[in-house]
A protein has these predicted regions:
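Short, solvent-exposed amphipathic alpha-helical segments in soluble enzyme
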Residues: 17-18, 169
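Helical cap/lid subdomain of alpha/beta-hydrolase-fold lipid enzymes
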Residues: 78-79, 83-223
Length: 223
């Protein structure tokens, strides 16, 4: 499943989806037109969608998330390891959600004002500095399942988020040379996403083929 970034929607992940489909992967939209919904509400909706897809496909899913999408992916992986076998984050400041450019901070303030003015369904001040923000932060610090495959792609040329905030210690870190907004369409980033998913495929096949007494040793090597 592909989750777009802050103030972006499913169309921004279309190029990534098309590439993955050409390579034989089945992709699913997050069903987000504009990613401005309260973080907790967005997470709950995504969790419901994950459950629906995982039940239909009878298998765990991998999430590829851009920016805020990657942060949502990490939260989902912490809550529902039964649904998720891997995540790939692209320019996602999971270690410090506030480590963003002031322009993005202004956008967040605008959403808060619109919410106070009566436009419902969007992020409020609580999402940036209240209980919602606190709960999201605590969730981002939850230890992940050791069997979860996690790749964090970051760029020192990001320009929007502090690249150091993207280096989740639970992830394998991959550096690229692109802008924040270019993450979802950059060919090099796409290659790294594809490589991460193929690695997951190979590991899944190895676990499925291995005798029961060898499965645990395979997991130890992976982690």
């Amino acid at each position: 499943m592909l989750i777009p970034g802050f103030m972006a929607g499913d169309p921004t992940m279309k190029a990534m989806s098309s590439m993955l489909r050409r390579e034989g992967f089945r992709t699913y939209r997050a069903q987000i037109w504009v990613n401005v919904r309260c973080t907790r509400e967005a997470g709950e909706r995504l969790e419901q969608r994950l459950e629906t897809i995982a039940t239909r496909r009878n298998r765990k899913l991998t999430i590829v998330g851009h920016s805020l999408g990657g942060m949502l992916a990490r939260g989902l992986a912490a809550r529902r390891p039964d649904l998720i076998e891997g995540i790939v984050s692209m320019g996602s400041p999971v270690l410090a959600p506030g480590a963003i450019h002031k322009v993005l901070a202004w956008d967040a303030q605008l959403l808060s004002r619109l919410t106070r003015a009566g436009f419902g369904g969007m992020m409020s001040a609580d999402c940036f500095g209240g209980d919602c923000a606190r709960l999201s932060w605590e969730e981002s610090q939850i230890a992940l399942d050791p069997d979860l495959a996690f790749t964090a792609i970051y760029s020192k040329r990001d320009g929007i988020v502090d690249w150091r905030a993207c280096l989740d210690p639970a992830a394998r870190h991959v550096e690229v040379r692109t802008s924040h907004c270019g993450m979802a369409v950059d060919p090099v980033v796409m290659d790294h996403v594809l490589a991460a998913l193929r690695d997951q495929q190979l590991r899944r096949a190895s676990l499925a083929a291995a005798p029961v007494d060898e499965v645990d040793s395979l997991r130890v090597v992976h982690t």
